[in-house]
UniProtKB/Swiss-Prot annotation:
Changing residue 792 to S: Loss of activity. Interacts with MPK18. This is Dual specificity protein phosphatase PHS1. It is an enzyme of class 3 (hydrolase).
Length: 929
């Protein structure tokens, strides 16, 4: 402790000299020892700002030491709950342990930030000349915090890490005299890629309807970078003249960060506090429902980008960070009626799918209200849980409401209630162990969240740390009071999750297209590199294997080298499957078909996996990409080739993104980095598509309908939803469509006991022949204490027929009673005409009379009463036939002939109703006698 005390006594000038020496001592050829594998790859790509990553790390250590000496730039101790916030400093509780000067400084800044309005960083009126002061949080280099340290503000170092500065500007607007200042946030990450990845994460947030602050990346090559330096120097001079030593130090640190970094992230300031720290987040049921709906969308976002630093979830092994989900009572975007992130995502979707309607929608809609009905894609029914259980629909009446509003629209979130997600960086490549874990956890979580209210409630309880939802009772009992309060909240949570899945499906195809575009261009680029550097590198080591996007059935364009002198050859080699993939067991939702966006088919593009998820081939490509950049500096022809490829990659990818209204955050800096940006973006997209594939497959699920406590009915989707079956306790599966494609591949004899029958859904099929054997299987399941699922392909005809036969033969119900019981919980049940006749005969055999009358579904052929020929299926066809073939008949005779035909049809069907009788929605009708 003595040495740090001495350092604190050293003058600032000496510390600054030490810092300069630290940077000058660095040798370009030294290996950056502190770097991880990922950082080494980024270093080889030339990504680390102004040198190796440890420069930024060591500078950050110096900043932390200064924070220990000079305090937190006046930033208040740990964000207080909204309930504890007051408008005046006199009403606020003070910490007696804090020095008076520091305490007053913190209160002063807290008041300034609270009263400041939010800068519209995208406005043309935004100017750095209005910058008045800079502040930043305290920094902590230790992960173990004492109780005293936990009361201090935490540095925002989640995902991308780095340093966060709070910038206060003099207000340029005189609309509100009480707000003389405006606030914004400046964030420096440890690398250019980390900054761009965070901007990419915000883009995903916007497209998924998650509320976010405004954010944009500013690169050092941008003229705005110089304006920031000049404004900071002016603010530093102002702080010096006022004797503000801390303010001067903060400005100095920002200038140092500008020298070290190649880009920064500028964001709008969010007035609020962590959601879980606010007692008002869930004080009313209405607010709780709105928060739950927003959390459903945020969960989809974090599953896609694999962000484990926001929502705590033991099942997903996410540690969570409540500070990255803020509750605010102010609109996040600018006060000048700037559209919120949900509106921007909606606009992008409309521009893509209905460009002609975009202008009219813009004119007609309100600035703060968006009807999400227009945002639903045609694939809603595929992604929304296809639950046929009527009890589930009763519990969740709005689960199928196509008018579901976005959690960020004015109908679902009041003007004084917003949940804002911050720090949504997209990781480069998750470790192999986490990827393997995701492949096991994702399918189960998504499937059960869609199909089980109880599971959804438990999950909501976990991610809100007990604020919403309810834990699973140890004795399995739940009070009616708890259920009545929680059910609407859980319903909104599931609705928000479903809405996020729909939005995800909307731009999934675009992401696949973008990945394929990058894949084709980079393959050609790497082939050119291989040809250019073949004298220096092992061709076999550098050969680019066949990309999965080429073998996935998509026709892609081949891009020749931009240079006319060099035509890259297609050097492809077969790579063995990833070791990580070989070690991953087959999950129940996995299929034999390989998806072009699946990790299994893509892994060979990069070769075998190394430690930490870094593939060895990827490391070689990264190293050779770095070396090729060095080689191009001394070889004029290679330099020209590289410039042409940078331009081609940038133009092709940017064009595709602009056409679809998508901002990746990449390709906005120097043109010399386009090849590197393309490669890094592709790596991130691969793993995003991998997770989207897991989510989409799991979302294609169905909850079986419960006929009685131990008997369920469903379709093929229900039979494949094994996590749902296990959750329901199903042990036996009666399959009536074993001969159909894919059924044998989706059975799991290690988990369930199967009885397979091959019955076609035809009227002539003798389904009666399997009744006894099927009933014996069901009876066997009941006797062993199990639960049985009866399913066919669609869960409509064959399975419904067998269940009705079981209820009549085993439970002694009449056909009418069995039909009512089945239709009450499984509304799509509809035996075909042939099966219906069999059931009617069975009803008469068991009870001596028919309790229901059959009404056939298929229309009968209209036969001409004059000549006896088939005229068609409709009455209009018969009338046309009479007019053409029997012209001598008068119009009255035609009507008479029509009446004759109708009378014959009525007699054949034994119906007492007249010509104008309406059709029943049921296949069966109660017997009139």
């Amino acid at each position: 402790m003595a040495e740090p005390e001495k350092k604190r006594d050293q003058p600032f000038s000496q510390e600054k000299d030490e810092e300069k020496d630290l940077y000058l001592v660095h040798d370009e050829h030294e290996s950056p020892l502190p770097l991880t594998v990922t950082s080494r790859v980024l270093y080889m790509l030339g990504d680390i700002a102004s040198g190796p990553a440890y420069r930024f790390t060591q500078w950050l250590d110096l900043v932390r030491k200064r924070s220990a000496t000079y305090g937190s730039s006046g930033f208040p101790h740990r964000l207080h709950r909204i309930d504890d916030m007051v408008t005046s400093a006199g009403e606020r509780n003070t910490d007696p342990k804090s020095p008076p000067s520091r305490q007053s400084s913190e209160i002063s800044l807290w008041e300034r930030l609270g009263k400041a309005s939010t800068v519209d960083i995208d406005s043309s009126c935004f100017s750095w000349n209005m910058l008045s002061s800079l502040h930043h949080t305290e920094h902590s280099s230790s992960t173990d915090h004492s109780e005293e340290d936990q009361s201090k503000p935490l540095e925002v170092t989640v995902n991308s890490g780095g340093v966060v500065f709070f910038a206060l500007f003099n207000s340029s607007s005189s609309e509100d005299a009480s707000r003389k200042e405006e606030a914004a946030v400046i964030k420096f990450a440890s690398s250019r890629m980390a900054t761009q990845s965070e901007r990419l994460g915000y883009e995903f947030s916007k497209w998924l309807g998650v509320q976010i602050p405004q954010a944009r990346v500013i690169h050092s090559c941008n003229p705005e970078w110089t304006l920031i330096k000049e404004a900071t120097e002016k603010a530093q001079a102002k702080a010096t003249s006022e004797g503000d030593e801390v303010g001067e130090m903060t400005c100095s640190e920002l200038l140092e960060a500008l020298e070290l970094s190649r880009c920064l992230l500028l964001m709008s300031y969010v007035h609020g506090c962590p959601m879980l720290e606010s007692m008002s987040s869930f004080e009313t049921e209405e607010k709780a429902e709105r928060a739950a709906a927003a959390l459903g969308r945020i969960l989809v976002l974090d599953l896609v980008i694999r962000n484990e630093d926001r929502l705590p979830c033991r099942q997903l092994r996410w540690r969570g960070n409540p500070a990255n989900l803020l509750l605010t009572d102010r609109i996040v975007s600018s006060a000048k009626h700037h559209e919120c992130s949900f509106d921007e995502a909606f606009d992008s979707a409309i521009k893509r799918y209905h460009p002609k309607d975009y202008r009219s929608i813009q004119r007609e809609r309100r600035a703060s209200s968006v009807d999400s009905r227009s945002r639903l894609s045609i694939s809603d029914q595929m992604l929304v849980s296809q639950a046929s259980d009527f009890s589930d629909i009763t519990e969740s009446p709005r689960s199928y409401d196509t008018g579901l509003m976005s959690p960020m629209s004015d109908r679902s979130v009041a003007a004084d209630f917003h949940l804002v997600a911050i720090d949504s960086g997209v990781p480069r490549r998750p470790p192999a162990g986490k990827r393997a874990s995701d492949q096991e956890i994702y399918p189960r979580l998504v499937e059960l969240l869609l199909n089980s209210s109880q599971y959804s409630s438990n999950l909501l309880h976990e991610i809100t740390e007990g604020s919403l939802g309810y834990p699973q009772a140890e004795d399995g009992e739940e009070t009616s009071n708890v259920r009545s309060v929680v059910t609407p909240v859980v319903r909104e949570f599931r609705n928000g999750f479903r809405a996020g899945l729909r939005d995800l499906q909307e731009f999934h195809i675009f992401l696949v297209t973008l990945h394929q575009k990058l894949d084709v261009l980079l393959r050609a680029f790497f082939s050119m590199m291989d040809k250019t550097m073949c004298a220096d590198f092992d061709r076999e080591d550098f050969a680019v294997p066949e990309s999965p996007s080429h073998t996935h059935g998509h026709e892609v364009n081949h891009y020749p080298s931009p240079s006319k002198d060099r035509v890259p050859s297609d050097n492809s080699s077969d790579h063995s499957e990833s070791d990580m993939q070989k070690s991953v067991p087959r999950t129940p939702n996995s299929e034999n078909k390989e998806d072009g966006s699946s990790p299994k088919s893509r892994e060979s593009w990069h070769g075998r996996s190394g430690k930490g998820g870094e593939s060895l081939s990827s490391q070689r490509l990264a190293a050779k990409l770095r070396d090729f950049h060095k080689f191009a500096k001394v070889d004029a022809e290679s330099n020209k080739e590289l410039d042409q490829w940078n331009e081609t990659l940038r133009n092709e990818v940017m064009k595709l993104c602009q056409e679809n209204g998508f901002n990746t955050g990449f390709f906005e800096g120097s043109d010399n980095n386009s090849c590197t940006d393309a490669y890094e973006l592709k790596v991130r997209l691969e793993h995003i598509l991998e997770r989207i594939s897991l989510i989409s497959k799991a979302a294609n699920t169905e909850k079986p309908s419960m006929i009685q406590e131990n008997l369920f009915i469903g379709g093929g989707l229900a039979a494949r939803s094994i996590y749902t079956l296990q959750h329901l306790g199903i042990t036996h599966v009666l399959c009536l469509c074993a001969n159909e494609i894919g059924q044998s591949d989706t059975q799991y004899p290690d988990l369930f006991e199967y009885q397979n029958f091959s019955i076609t859904d035809d009227e002539d099929s003798n389904i009666e022949s399997i009744f006894q054997e099927a009933l014996d299987f069901i009876k066997h399941g009941e006797e062993t204490g199990g639960k049985i699922l009866v399913h066919c392909f669609e869960g409509r005809s064959r399975s419904a027929t067998v269940v009705l036969a079981y209820l009549m033969l085993q439970k002694k119900l009449t056909l009418l009673e069995a039909w009512s019981k089945l239709r009450k919980v499984h509304r799509r049940a509809q035996p075909n005409d042939g099966f219906a006749r069999i059931l009617i005969n069975l009803d008469k055999k068991c009870h001596g009379k028919v309790s229901m009358e059959w009404r056939q579904r298929k229309p009968t052929m209209k036969v001409c009463p004059v000549c006896g020929k088939n005229a068609g299926l409709s009455s209009s066809s018969l009338k046309l036939h009479l007019q053409k073939s029997h012209r001598k008949l008068s119009s009255g005779s035609v009507d008479s002939a029509m009446n004759m035909e109708i009378q014959k049809a009525l007699e054949a069907l034994k119906l007492s109703t007249g010509r104008g009788s309406s059709a029943s929605s049921n296949s069966f009708q109660s017997h009139p006698g």
